[in-house]
Amino acid sequence: MQGKPRIAVIGAGLGGTAGAALMARAGFNVRLYEQAPAFSRLGAGIHLGPNVMKIMRRIGIEDELNRQGSHPDYWYSRDWQSGAELARIPLGDYAVSHYGATYLTVHRGDFHALMTAALPAGLLQFNKRLTRVDEDDDVVRLHFADGSVEEAEIVIGADGVNSRLREHLLGAELPKYTGYVAHRAVFPTPLDSGSLPFDMCVKWWSDDRHMMVYFVTGKRDEIYYVTGVPEQQWDMGKSWVPSSKAEMRAAFAGWHPTVQALIEATPEVSKWPLLERDPLPLWSRGRIVLLGDACHPMKPHMAQGAAMAIEDAAMLTRIFEQTGLQDHAAAFRLYEDNRAERASRVQRVSHDNTWLRTNENPDWCFGYDVYAEPLVEGRRAAA
């Protein structure tokens, strides 16, 4: 092997892009491979808590995110019918003073575009769908659908819930359908809301379903909602299907007038299955390591799924900087030791869908700083 060890990141979602950006800034020889032909502004929003914004500071896009995003003063939880306040979690200025970074909501596509723009030229390659993986003691060979073959000494699987690299490590297994779907819609903020309580960030709760609503721009001219609604079956051959205003009316019949107004203002809505996996017995083997949904997919009910992938990427970069890449097995063990317990906790709480329904202390989540956490060894077995 000549020159620096080569790192290949498979999957340019939020976790993979963050990892490639951080590793490039740290001086590693990294390439990022994405199966899509290009990116578009997909219709979804995202929460970026202080735990993520501190990582964006390292990538160099914190200020622009703060300009583009919406900064809610509180996370509200409300009763589905009466609108009564169930919880009010301070964010806004409190997040800055207490956690050391902002809490914002933003359009997922805008966030992804900023991270992608932070990558060095030529690092990201599109139209790279992974079809086969060969490995020996010294190198991993990545075979793509376009006929190309790339080699790397380290391969990072950031390729999502249906990860090809997870399948290579552990065998083929479909993720679990949880019995819930998420309806998603992004659209211009209704102008005729009158006196209805359009909170900047609110989750409406009933016993068996919910709707999370927030602005995705600093101008508050675009609003997003995502639901959790029970649905007995899902065709696992489909990643999503169109929904409709009629389906939304039926799912949320009798809900508060604010929810009804949002439904009536919805031009288009899609429906997605909520998928999970049991915690994996391993996150790495040989020269391959997983991050994000490839190893711990979760329901979105804490708004922390992407955050966990980004934290994984930051921790892996931090450990590579500390240990170097020659003893990759030791680096991977240290990564699991310092990520598996937290990711599993977030996965459990997300599954239970109890997060911030009452006035609880979110410090363990929002106050986490991947760069300040003391590194520990041997904790993986306890996760």
Curated annotation (Swiss-Prot):
Effect of H47E: Almost complete loss of 6-HNA hydroxylation activity (0.02% of wild-type). Ability to oxidize NADH is also greatly diminished
Family of this protein: Belongs to the 6-hydroxynicotinate 3-monooxygenase family.
GO molecular function: 6-hydroxynicotinate 3-monooxygenase activity; FAD binding
Active site: H47, Y214
Phylogenetic classification of the source organism: Bacteria, Pseudomonadati, Pseudomonadota, Betaproteobacteria, Burkholderiales
Name this polypeptide is given: 6-hydroxynicotinate 3-monooxygenase
Catalytic activity, EC: 1.14.13.114
Effect of H47 to A/F: Unable to bind FAD
UniProt keyword annotation of Phosphoprotein present: no
UniProt cross-references to InterPro entries, sorted A to Z: FAD-bd (IPR002938), FAD-dep_Monooxygenase_BioMet (IPR050493), FAD/NAD-bd_sf (IPR036188)
